[in-house]
């Protein structure tokens, strides 16, 4: 059985998908862009602003599921440029404590809405 998780504190999905799905002991959070829910626009045009907002969106969705960032066991980060890797790592690291989630990071040709970063997460209940 699966349950749709939706937070009004994170942006609506921009396509035919849910913000998150909970099933059994796992919560799968869809990729989050750095979109500010109050404006529907990117929080900023820079990697720092977009990464921070992406993480805040994940945090809000997890909170709706009754979880915190300490429940995250795996993330995937998609970057427009791996040149932003160090900046993203600094921000990302501030949201977690050891043991850190497993993670994969990829550079991609293009992201939705020409975003600089997209982050998805898997959490355990």
From Swiss-Prot:
Q: Which GO terms describe its molecular function?
A: deaminase activity
A Pfam family annotated for this chain is Ribonuc_L-PSP
Q: Which Gene3D superfamilies match?
A: RutC-like
Q: Which residues form the signal peptide?
A: none
Q: Which domain of life is it from?
A: Bacteria
**This protein's GO CC annotations:** cytosol
InterPro entries assigned to the protein according to its UniProt record, in alphabetical order: RidA, RidA_CS, RutC-like_sf, YjgF/YER057c/UK114
Its family remark reads: Belongs to the RutC family.
For this protein, the record's NCBIfam families field holds: Rid family detoxifying hydrolase
The name of this protein is RutC family protein HP_0944
Origin species: Helicobacter pylori (strain ATCC 700392 / 26695)
């Amino acid at each position: 059985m699966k349950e749709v998780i939706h937070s009004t504190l994170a942006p609506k999905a921009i396509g035919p998908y849910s913000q998150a799905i909970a099933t059994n002991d796992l919560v799968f959070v869809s990729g989050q862009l750095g979109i500010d829910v109050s404006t529907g626009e990117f929080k900023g045009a820079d990697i720092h602003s977009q990464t921070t907002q992406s993480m805040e969106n994940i945090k809000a969705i997890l909170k709706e599921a009754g979880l915190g960032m300490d429940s995250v066991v795996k993330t995937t980060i998609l970057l427009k440029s791996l040149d932003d890797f160090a900046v993203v790592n600094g921000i990302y690291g501030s949201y977690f404590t050891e043991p850190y989630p497993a993670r994969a990071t990829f550079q991609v040709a293009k992201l939705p809405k020409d975003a600089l970063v997209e982050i998805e997460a898997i959490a355990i209940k």
